[in-house]
Amino acid sequence: MNLRIHPSILNAKHDDMQAEFDRIAAGVDSIHLDIMDGRFVKPVTFDIPTIARYVKMCPLEFDAHLMIVEPEKHVDEYIQAGASLVNFHLEVTSNPEALIDHLHERGVKAGLTINPNTPVEELIGLAHRIELALFMSVYPGYGGQQFIPEVLDKVRAFKRHCAGRGLDPLVQIDGGINLETAPRAVAAGVNTLVAGTFIFRSEDYAEAIASLREVCEGVEPDY
């Protein structure tokens, strides 16, 4: 299993992002942007000019996690800013199929996100349409929350569905990821870790990233 790590830069030092990107770029696979509008969740983060500026600073792909209402009205702005993958919450759109189709028409990958209390069946029904499924293991809005282990049962159900049908979207988890929770998530079927607080509050980013890979190496799936 090729483990992917997408650092969430919400807790990075934004007064010197070029240095932050330089410190993490060699050890990770993509950059995770937690985009919040102050409506779906309370904080407001990462306006379009900021995203466009960050994309120019870093050669990696940017994974835009839209924690916003009415994502269908705004996705084109994030694509234009440089996002390579856009994932949106099932909880805030009445026609996810149309939005997935629009993302594909624009040439970007489509991801779907569910909160910890959203039935996984809603995501399973669209597994064949997406490149990434994101399971929130905390409630969205703020970094540093405690991991919700019950989410892993939803990951297992999703992975069993995909395995039985030859589907292989990325399975991403976001929230409370550290050296204890990362291998548990990987065992459940996760292959893409979003880690923010664990990386950016460490003294050595490269060491933190390497340690995540190390604890997940050789973990056997239990789904």
For the regions a protein language model found, what residue spans apply to each?
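Hydrophobic faces of well-ordered beta-strands that scaffold small-molecule active sites
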Residues: I5-S8, I31-L33, F62-L66, V86-F88, ...
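Conserved, mostly hydrophobic/aromatic
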Residues: M17, I24, D34, Y78, ...
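Catalytic cores of alpha/beta
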Residues: F21, E72-Q80, T118-R129, I177-T192
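Structural motif
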Residues: A26-G27, M57, A81, R106, ...
